[in-house]
Amino acid sequence: MSLGIRYLALLPLFVITACQQPVNYNPPATQVAQVQPAIVNNSWIEISRSALDFNVKKVQSLLGKQSSLCAVLKGDAYGHDLSLVAPIMIENNVKCIGVTNNQELKEVRDLGFKGRLMRVRNATEQEMAQATNYNVEELIGDLDMAKRLDAIAKQQNKVIPIHLALNSGGMSRNGLEVDNKSGLEKAKQISQLANLKVVGIMSHYPEEDANKVREDLARFKQQSQQVLEVMGLERNNVTLHMANTFATITVPESWLDMVRVGGIFYGDTIASTDYKRVMTFKSNIASINYYPKGNTVGYDRTYTLKRDSVLANIPVGYADGYRRVFSNAGHALIAGQRVPVLGKTSMNTVIVDITSLNNIKPGDEVVFFGKQGNSEITAEEIEDISGALFTEMSILWGATNQRVLVD
């Protein structure tokens, strides 16, 4: 009787369990993820892997074992895309990378760089507090800033490596003025901050003149020696560095312990023609139209056709970094031939005259900077028309166009 009662007590559980069992259960079909097609862009920047790799190796060969290399990749690698450039530096065993903002610090570390990571400008207190996560060597040029960084380091129980910037080059930007007792005393106090470690002393050249470089170098050598003495630091324990791209190529004695170079990696230097350009700015023809002599072109009718003309519509404008200064002044390359920009550059459109060309069709490649066939739009041409440094333009183009690694 008791056994029957026990089974009756379990009956509700059997019923519930049975009700929970699937009937004619069919497992869901495996969902196959659809591959999304790549977005087709109206314009893009090609970054030549082979040219970049060539330039890096050439700099390394130039320096040999006489000095170390810090690759400056600030400004999103001068507009060339840090995420594309940094891995090539890592592949070439570059030991030091210089950047500016915390996003760049994070990106370089996330890409797997394990070497020295240096900030090459003064940082805000908020930046410095966060940057301790990335094991960065901060640039310090005044006592107050050093004290604030020391407090951050103490709060986080860390010792932060720093590079003391001197104003030896006369930039009057980041550096500590040490040509007087007050400046030397500040340098001494910086060295005594318990949570900072001086690992480098640096300065910067404000102009590209070999004789001026030598003058500034002599001043830096003298001042850095004085600073080392008041700080009580061993010379072999501190990296001295001042050379930029121009100084590195033209004044070898400026190399010291390390050089900081950036533009040279992209072929952007007046000091040598031995380095290759890395960037090409491209688009395609959207449409072709025929217009009679006397028609005007673009906003404000700034150009009047002098003949019956064939005009190509290129989907690039100042929204893509092709500024209005190129209106009626710039050129593009189509089929290896130079063609003039007519009228004012619109936000999203440029018109070029292809009347003299044959067999041109929509979809054909257009180059606004770089080489196509035997023709080239040079950096000097871009600078002459725009009134801007080419670096300004490359950073602008990089910020407004997709960058793709080629060859």
Curated annotation (Swiss-Prot):
Subcellular location: Cell membrane; Periplasm
PROSITE patterns: ALANINE_RACEMASE (PS00395), PROKAR_LIPOPROTEIN (PS51257)
Matching CDD domains: PLPDE_III_AR2 (cd06826)
Active site: 74 (proton acceptor), 299 (proton acceptor)
Lipidation (S-diacylglycerol cysteine): 19
Residue pairs linked by disulfide bridges in the UniProt entry: 70-96
Cofactor: pyridoxal 5'-phosphate
Lipid anchor positions (N-palmitoyl cysteine): 19
Chief location category: membrane
Temperature dependence: Optimum temperature is 50 degrees Celsius. More than 78% of maximal activity is observed at 40 degrees Celsius and 60 degrees Celsius.
Keywords recorded for this protein, A-Z: Cell membrane, Disulfide bond, Isomerase, Lipoprotein, Membrane, Palmitate, Periplasm, Pyridoxal phosphate, Signal
PTM annotation (N6-(pyridoxal phosphate)lysine): residues: 74
Record text on activity regulation: The racemization activity of Lyr is completely inhibited by hydroxylamine.
This enzyme's EC code(s): 5.1.1.5
SMART domains named in the record: Ala_racemase_C
Keyword Cell membrane recorded: yes
InterPro entries (alphabetical): Ala_racemase, Ala_racemase/Decarboxylase_C, Ala_racemase_C, Ala_racemase_N, Ala_racemase_pyridoxalP-BS, PLP-binding_barrel, Racemase_Bsr/Lyr
Activity across pH: Optimum pH is 8.0-9.0.
Binding-site positions, substrate: 173, 347
Signal peptide: 1-18
Similarity field: Belongs to the alanine racemase family. Bsr subfamily.
HAMAP family reported for this sequence: Bsr_racemase
Further facts: The active-site cleft is located at the dimeric interface and contains the two conserved catalytic residues, a lysine from one subunit and a tyrosine from the other subunit.
Quaternary data: Forms a head-to-tail homodimer in the structure.
Its job: Amino-acid racemase that catalyzes the interconversion of L-lysine and D-lysine. To a lesser extent, is also able to interconvert arginine enantiomers. Cannot use methionine, asparagine, alanine, leucine, glutamine, phenylalanine and histidine as substrates.
Protein name in the entry: Lysine racemase
Species this protein is from: Proteus mirabilis
GN (gene name): lyr
